[in-house]
Amino acid sequence: GPMYLRFTRDAIPQIYDEDAEFVIGKANQLKEGKDVAIIANGDTVRLALDAAKELEAKGITARVLDMHTVKPLDTEAVTACINEIGKVITVEDHNILNGLGSAVCEVAAEMGKGVVKRIGVQDQYGQSAPYERLLAMNGITVENIVKTAEELQ
């Protein structure tokens, strides 16, 4: 079926072992937590994991999911985050409209509960800059994830 791949020019840290398995439509839970869920994909997964470490030092535990497949979305994993935690942050290096954040918001809306905060590119024209600078310009940072999680507590 249809698919797309996105690549950055910069080298990114390796999160998975070479023998890691991925199932289309099934998120990979990388960390357990009970205070907030952080759902990310692509390179932003490393930011989510780094934010979870910082949050843990502040007494806030974060469940981190790598939602490597946006369509089909792992609605079971999203539903579990909303039912068990109720507070979700999505992180993506993509427009917050019609991406991971929107898909998670649709699940929460159908359920009629939960709070979802989206971190990503706002609905604006893109800019040109080095990758890390673009992330910072759009608030896609460890600091912003931590701040957002703290505001949800």
Each model region followed by its residue ranges:
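Amphipathic alpha-helical interface segments
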Residues: 1
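Thiamine diphosphate
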Residues: 8-153
